[in-house]
């Protein structure tokens, strides 16, 4: 039975696990779409959702405190600035559900289930077709 089991361990120490999730959070905020294994994507989702909510709460008021709080959590000023300046404006009218997990088959080497985790409502670069 899974009583009182909160998170996955990923066969890592707690410091390694937190560093991995922190790096994945920063990558997702910067690139807005990353590919990883399905369990890692499922574990990453609540961390990113909470960071975006913090950015939304402190966007209008207490901006300096909000930036300092995000920098203390994710240790990356560029990602914290993007959370406050870009993502909090984009998700101003959305109450949660900022990420999407798309299953992406299996990895060739070890058949691990892969997934793409991305931010919803992101800008997609379009390529024009010349009609050829």
From Swiss-Prot:
The keyword Ribosomal protein applies. Transmembrane segments: none annotated. It comes from the Bacteria. GO terms for molecular function: structural constituent of ribosome. Keywords: Ribonucleoprotein, Ribosomal protein. GO terms for cellular component: cytosolic large ribosomal subunit. InterPro entries: Ribosomal_bL17, Ribosomal_bL17_CS, Ribosomal_bL17_sf. Coiled coil: none annotated. One of its GO terms (biological process) is translation. The keyword Membrane does not apply. Part of the 50S ribosomal subunit. Contacts protein L32. Belongs to the bacterial ribosomal protein bL17 family. This is Large ribosomal subunit protein bL17. It comes from Ehrlichia canis (strain Jake).
